[in-house]
Amino acid sequence: MRGVTAPNRTVVSPMVQYRATDGLVNDYHIVHLGKFALGKFGIVFTENCAVEPRGRVTQGDLGMWDDGQIEGHKRLTRFLQREGSLAATQITHAGRKASSPRQFDKPDEFGPRDGGWQRWQVVGPSALSAGERYSESPLALDVPEMEAIVKKFGEAARRADAAGYDIIEIHGAHGYLLAQFLSPLSNKRNDAYGGDRAGRMKFPLAAAQAVRENWPEHKPMFIRVSAVDGGGGWDVDDTVAYAHELKALGIDVVDTSSGGLTGLSTAAPIKRALGFQVPFAAAVKRGAGIPTMAVGLILDGPQAEKVLQDGDADLIAIGRQALYDPFWPVHAAQELGCDTDFGMWNPEYGWWLDKRKNNLPADRAATGQAIK
């Protein structure tokens, strides 16, 4: 990808942890993300980093809105890269879904970590709430405010580069601000930024252009999209048209998810099954001629390899399965018969595990898994 080479096609998806104070990286983030590098993921993404404080989903989100946040991100990128992974970050503005309790908390429930925090005024393309869990109707952004946010996306890209990230991704999915502009269900504007598809794409494309202009030419840029919004307002054909425009701006990979326009869900109300979002990645890849990243209930090596061999996507993003198994890539390699002696593991782990397998039953020796 441009001037960057990943050691493999496995990616840790951005997953919010709500453990930051003032948007700063801390020891928790180093440990949480660092273990994925030890597990040999090719690309490790941070959670979404807000481009301004009011763009945070919760007060515990990471940030990329202030130069004072760069040094903490440098600690993280140095560790990830030293262990062989590409360091990637995702930037976002939550729009009308900002100022929320953590997803595992009840609405309006704030715990000891919240320190008396109160909701702040949220914004969006129109004065329409995202649902009962979220703040009351947002303030509809005017054009000067939108231009200021576009500038903040560009400034966040500059900070991400200063922090040493190899890859940047815009979070334009799951009902956050850019997705709010795209969907006619949340964008009821009657100016140049609303109306037909071209109008609704105008603000997200401006944000993408600002990031590309402030992100080095030799570094790749991704964007996460919801291929369908879950309510019938935005569909796969819209996403393919959008991807054509993104490709023209210099976006390198479309990270293809779905849903999240309202409520908690980050996927559209479609039947959940193994790889249920892979067809979206395939449709965008073939329809727009742009590399894609597949995500969504991809659980093991053979399943992931089939997605790649079928040409449905170029990268495999692992989310919750990575939380369950931070060593997913090396386990996948063992499942595929690519590593029988733990040679793909860090030697600090692999040497010991290779010795350990000699004490295991034959049917367990290939992977070194414990007997259940």
Question: How would you describe each model-predicted region?
Answer:
Residues M1-K372:
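Flavin-dependent oxidoreductase catalytic cores
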